A protein has these predicted regions:
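Conserved donor sugar-nucleotide recognition element shared by glycan-biosynthetic enzymes
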Residues: 140, 148, 181, 242, ...
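Hydrophobic alpha-helix immediately C-terminal to the catalytic Tyr-X-X-X-Lys motif of short-chain
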Residues: 147, 151, 155, 188, ...
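A structural alpha-helix within SAM-dependent methyltransferase catalytic domains
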Residues: 21, 100-104, 153, 189, ...
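Generic structural signal for alpha-helix termini and adjacent loop/cap motifs
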Residues: 15, 36, 84, 102, ...
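A conserved pocket-lining segment of Rossmann-fold NAD(P)-dependent short-chain dehydrogenase/reductase
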Residues: 81, 132-133, 163-177, 187-211, ...
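N-terminal Rossmann-like NAD(P)+-binding domain of SDR-like oxidoreductases, especially those catalyzing
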Residues: 1-171
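C-terminal substrate-binding subdomain of Rossmann-fold SDR/epimerase-dehydratase oxidoreductases
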Residues: 193-307
Length: 307
């Protein structure tokens, strides 16, 4: 199959590109490199350094005979969305809508969209949250992802486009950007590389459902290979406090230092843990990488980058 991966030089997208290519698919990547890095790009992928809103994208889709779109280019920072909601909406709603219109006009068969579990569900009323949990986002980022999901549902119903929404829990792993606030594991790893203490926001008892990017890539392969139209959580169902995460990472690193605590962040929910039962029962996917194994892989990646 000929697949377009947007954001394919980025953290999650680059792993998906690798997985698709290993499975024998032909992959085209578009990335404006605002956060992606060429060093993460698989050399077997065809690469175009353009923005999704560039009119040339239609010609790229035509010339590469694209059958499926996997849309991972996005604004991913909750804090940035609070500062500039308009930029967030342009990135996560308008660009998604542009791609959806291209997909319909060119009769592309499938559209896979990277969404978010934690930010869409907001403060959970039950644990773990399944796909039927009320959506009550606490940030413009969560709002924009939910709006994009609704557009996918519309395009599926109105035009028959096969659409798959994957709602990720907190993804971590190699290639993650340590700059900003989106990836706490990467931020902690970078500080440890400098022999600095990890800084935990608030009291550290807030919880997240951490999932390895390798498991996310496998979920995207299943979404491509199966007719799984709809919305699916991709998570571990395991709840980990930020304090516990820091302790585990310090143990992995062997560093004889402790974590510090800073101020709490606006827009953060207190608990987040996601139920992946629907995706598992429908298509057999389940997480394979333990938290500690994933932290070892991520820490070693940052260590090798430093060396």
């Amino acid at each position: 199959m000929n697949i377009l991966v947007t954001g394919g030089a980025g953290f999650i997208g680059s792993h998906i590109v690798n997985t698709y290519i290993e499975a024998g698919h032909c992959v085209t990547v578009i990335d404006n490199l605002s956060s992606g890095r060429l060093q993460f790009l698989n050399p077997k992928a065809k690469f175009y350094e353009i923005d999704i809103l560039d009119p040339k994208i239609t010609e790229v889709l035509k010339s590469e005979k694209i059958n499926a779109i996997n849309h991972h280019a996005a604004q991913i920072s909750v804090s940035e969305s609070l500062i500039d909601p308009l930029f967030d909406a342009n990135s996560n709603i308008i660009r998604t809508l542009q791609l959806l219109q291209c997909a319909v006009s060119l009769k592309i068969e499938k559209f896979i969209f990277a969404s978010t579990g934690g930010a869409i569900y907001g403060e959970q009323i039950y644990f773990p949250a399944n796909e039927d949990h009320p959506c009550q986002p606490l940030s413009p980022y969560g709002i924009s992802k939910l709006s994009a999901e609704n557009y996918l549902s519309f395009f599926n119903q109105q035009f028959g486009l096969s659409t798959t929404v994957l709602r990720y829990s907190n993804v971590f792993g190699p290639h993650q950007n340590p700059h900003g606030e989106a990836g706490v594991v990467a931020i902690f790893c970078e500080r440890l590389m400098k022999d600095q203490k990890p800084v935990v926001c608030g009291d550290g008892e807030q919880t997240r459902d951490f999932i390895s990017v390798r498991d996310i890539a496998q979920a995207n392969l299943i979404a491509l290979d199966h007719s799984c139209t709809g919305k699916f959580n991709v998570a571990t169902g395991n709840e980990t406090s930020i304090n516990s995460l820091a302790e585990c990472l310090l143990r992995v690193s062997g560093k004889k230092i402790s974590a510090d605590h800073g101020s709490a962040r606006q827009g953060d929910q207190s608990r987040s843990v996601i139920d992946y039962k629907k995706f598992h029962e429908g298509f057999g996917w389940q997480p394979e990488v333990s938290l500690e194994q994933g932290l070892v892989e991520t820490y070693n990646f940052f260590k090798n980058q430093t060396n």
